[in-house]
Amino acid sequence: MNLVISILAITIILSSILAVVSFWLPQMNPDAEKLSPYECGFDPLGSARLPFSIRFFLVAILFLLFDLEIALLLALPWGDQLYSATGTFFWATAVLILLTLGLIYEWTQGGLEWAE
């Protein structure tokens, strides 16, 4: 236990020292050039905020969902070593079915179609 406390203390002290040094070291000389908006070396001609396509947002959300599904399924082979392996497989299958139904719903609603 003393080893854990000493490692924790060293970590806190080292991170505090690094945080204090990071505030002292940089040269903080903000001028008009550094405070102005920068867009690829040119002055912005119009609004820099373009409308974001909802299609990209939907694909990103679907990617996150199925990325989490893969993370869930990677640990599944070790699930048979648990006390109640049947329960583990039941809940993993339930999550897999739920995500599959969500994908089918998204597909039938046209969320994966790029052309209108």
Curated annotation (Swiss-Prot):
Keywords: Electron transport, Membrane, Mitochondrion, NAD, Respiratory chain, Translocase, Transmembrane, Transmembrane helix, Transport, Ubiquinone
Example of a GO MF term: NADH dehydrogenase (ubiquinone) activity
Catalytically driven reaction(s): a ubiquinone + NADH + 5 H(+)(in) = a ubiquinol + NAD(+) + 4 H(+)(out)
Pfam families associated with the record: Oxidored_q4
GO cellular component: mitochondrial membrane; NADH dehydrogenase complex
Recorded topology in the membrane: Multi-pass membrane protein
InterPro entries linked to this entry: NADH_UbQ/plastoQ_OxRdtase_su3, NDAH_ubi_oxred_su3_sf
Subcellular location: Mitochondrion membrane
Principal subcellular localization: mitochondrion
Membrane spanning residue stretches: 3-23, 56-76, 85-105
EC number(s) per entry: 7.1.1.2
Top-rank lineage group of the source organism: Eukaryota
PANTHER family: NADH-UBIQUINONE OXIDOREDUCTASE CHAIN 3
Function: Core subunit of the mitochondrial membrane respiratory chain NADH dehydrogenase (Complex I) that is believed to belong to the minimal assembly required for catalysis. Complex I functions in the transfer of electrons from NADH to the respiratory chain. The immediate electron acceptor for the enzyme is believed to be ubiquinone.
Similarity field: Belongs to the complex I subunit 3 family.
Name listed for the protein in its UniProt record: NADH-ubiquinone oxidoreductase chain 3
Source organism: Formosania lacustris
Taxonomic lineage of the native organism: Eukaryota, Metazoa, Chordata, Craniata, Vertebrata
